[in-house]
Amino acid sequence: MTRRLGRPCQSDAEDTRVRILREARLAFTTRGYDNTTNREISAGAGITSAAIYHYFPSKVDLFVAVFDDVQTKVYDAFDAAVTRHDTFLEKFDALFDTMMDLGDEDPMLASFVVGVVTEAEHHPDLRTALRSVSPRNQLFLSELCADAKSRGELPEALPVQTAVDVLAGVLGGFARLSVTVRDRQRLRSVAKVYKNMSRSALSPASA
């Protein structure tokens, strides 16, 4: 029988933390915040239940850490995607392609992201704690749209904030759809329609 780990040595502390975050995200996504237990997470991570507290003092802290980890993964990928393109519409297209790639690599990723809002609504302490994490979505989209506006790539009459809200709604809607629709070809077809719609609504020629 493999002995589960207790207090970690410095050398494997980061690996253990990664395992805890992985198992916690799986549990939060499939079982929900209320039904997730340290015992379940520790069993999957190969450590004792008590060892989790060396990394995360509470379940709230653990959930926030998972959210921060997921946000970093998503927006680091978005940042890398848009830097490979020059125009706003090319970058917009790349966001959908990246979301599809992330979904292929990690099918449960979108489920956790979508579920965060619901969990925060039901748990005031969680909602308060999540505010400690800098929201990268608004910063990312604001910079993307402000840059496009300054280069004349958005309709002159379209405020930057409106463009940000449109992108947030479209990307959020696509994320929610990807949770219920597991057919990747269907999702790619929807992404293609969104891309075409953006050319009609967000290009200067549409003004």
Task: Outline where the language-model segments fall.
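Hydrophobic alpha-helical connector segments
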Residues: 65, 79-109, 160-167, 191
